[in-house]
Amino acid sequence: GVRTILVDGKGFHLNGKLIKFQGVCLHHDLGPLGAAVNRAALIRQIRILKDMGCDAIRTAHNMPSTMQMEVCDSMGMMVMAESFDMWLYPKCKNGYALHFRDWAERDMTNLVLCHRNHPCIVMWSIGNEIPEQWSVQGRQLSRWLQDICHRLDPTRPVTQGMDKAEASLQSGFAQVM
């Protein structure tokens, strides 16, 4: 049905109701199945999460599968779809930082275009504990990625996982969100 999303000083509202997420960060693997996508395993995973009181997941640092979003749609699980674990500053030697300049806009665009019609998606995340969160460059990149999301989907908020609160506030990085 029709839904509305609002974020204000009180928090996150879905269809006019204030929501306090009971969520988890969920990596894309299915335990011993690895990264293979299996509908029955996804249904089992979401059912277990719901049985323990979970109503939301944050996809951890990768574009989620369409099948996972379909299962979340059908089971009423809210999703924050997250794109990146790093931007320009590497967290490891062979990570996404090597490809960020060439691929970030396409990857962010693909995430939003692929999943924006899924009712389970309640917000977009442009990064997880990004090292640039303490810098002016990070603030600029954050604004750029947020603008991509809002251009393609003006109906949902954009956020990111920050682990250095004081530095994020001092650099203006946190205020972009």
Residues covered by each model-derived region:
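Active-site-adjacent substrate/metal-binding segments within catalytic domains
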Residues: G1-R143, V158-T159
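Extracellular glycoside hydrolase catalytic/binding regions
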Residues: Q140-M177
